[in-house]
UniProtKB/Swiss-Prot annotation:
One of several proteins that assist in the late maturation steps of the functional core of the 30S ribosomal subunit. Associates with free 30S ribosomal subunits (but not with 30S subunits that are part of 70S ribosomes or polysomes). Required for efficient processing of 16S rRNA. May interact with the 5'-terminal helix region of 16S rRNA. This is Ribosome-binding factor A. One of its GO terms (molecular function) is ribosomal small subunit binding. SUPFAM superfamilies: Ribosome-binding factor A, RbfA. It comes from Desulforapulum autotrophicum (strain ATCC 43914 / DSM 3382 / VKM B-1955 / HRM2). One of its GO terms (cellular component) is cytosol. The keyword Lipid metabolism does not apply. InterPro entries: KH_dom-like_a/b, RbfA, RbfA_dom_sf, Ribosome-bd_factorA_CS.
Amino acid sequence: MKPYPRSERVAARIQEILSDLIKKKVQDPRIELVTISSVRLTSDLRIAYVYFSVFGDEARVEEATQGLKSSHGFIKRHVASQLGLRYMPELKFIHDQSFDRGTHMDQLLKSVLKGDDSE
């Protein structure tokens, strides 16, 4: 028996393919700073939720989202050719806000520590 479900193995492979594709083959400048942080796949392998992060502000995130939407067909064809599944999962790109929340928490902790030092 495999150590983890097929959906997790396929999700890991999709993440690997997408990361490589964005780094090397997609020439859209709107998504050059996009990082694929994780992929979650439904148990029936029909929908892949692709979580991405972008270095920059909200305008940069919106640009990256539009870039991913406009490149969706190219990305899906490339992933399908590399994946070799009977059915290619539908890719749904979602901005991963965990990095933003982590940065915000870090700033809050630093401000609290600075406040303690001044007292």
